């Protein structure tokens, strides 16, 4: 299951840059990769002016490309009243002062975990299918885990390698591939070793 994400996602970014055809190609590509019914166009409601344009375009793309919509909320804190605390934490994280008008901040106070009733009030009249699809995803993702038990993935290692040697080898190969050289500069090797 995959979605087109918030305004920071690739498809919304293409829409905001005016490249609707590029956004449609990307959406089609993700749908092909994930399989029919597993890729969703994601509409949201927030204080960012560009969101309305992106939502309108995503609804049109949904019809044109036969891709399902979901309604989500970009949640960064639990309650709407936590917006001020979130803003303060952003200041701590970025080393900014709350009084600095030019600092990084979220627009509005609607990045909280909205209730189902709030989501229905926002999307229920115009895009009820987006909420139904969101619930379908939740139903598909439902999992029950036994408390007190660790669930770790199985990760088979090549013969003769430990986790440490395997990770080191894969990281070194990735560095060489990314830099397109068999002999990365010493400062890169030192940073890789540090990491």
Task: Give a label for each model feature.
Residues 1-195:
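Phosphodiester-processing cores and adjacent nucleic acid-binding clamps
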């Amino acid at each position: 299951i995959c979605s087109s994400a918030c305004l920071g996602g690739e498809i919304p970014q293409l829409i905001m840059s005016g490249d609707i055809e590029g956004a449609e190609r990307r959406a089609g590509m993700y749908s092909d990769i994930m399989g029919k019914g597993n890729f969703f166009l994601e509409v949201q409601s927030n204080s960012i002016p560009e969101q309305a344009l992106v939502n309108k375009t995503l609804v049109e793309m949904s019809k044109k490309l036969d891709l399902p919509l979901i309604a989500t909320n970009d949640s960064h804190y639990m309650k709407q009243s936590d917006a001020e605390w979130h803003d303060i934490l952003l200041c701590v994280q970025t080393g900014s002062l709350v009084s600095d008008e030019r600092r990084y901040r979220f627009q509005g106070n609607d990045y909280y975990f909205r209730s189902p009733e709030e989501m229905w009030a926002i999307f229920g009249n115009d895009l009820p299918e987006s909420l139904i699809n969101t619930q379908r995803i939740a139903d598909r993702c439902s999992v029950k885990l036994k408390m007190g038990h660790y669930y770790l993935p199985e990760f088979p290692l090549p013969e003769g390698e430990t986790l440490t040697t395997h990770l080191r080898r894969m990281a070194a190969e990735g560095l060489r591939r990314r830099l397109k050289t068999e002999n990365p500069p010493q400062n890169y090797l030192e940073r890789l070793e540090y990491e």
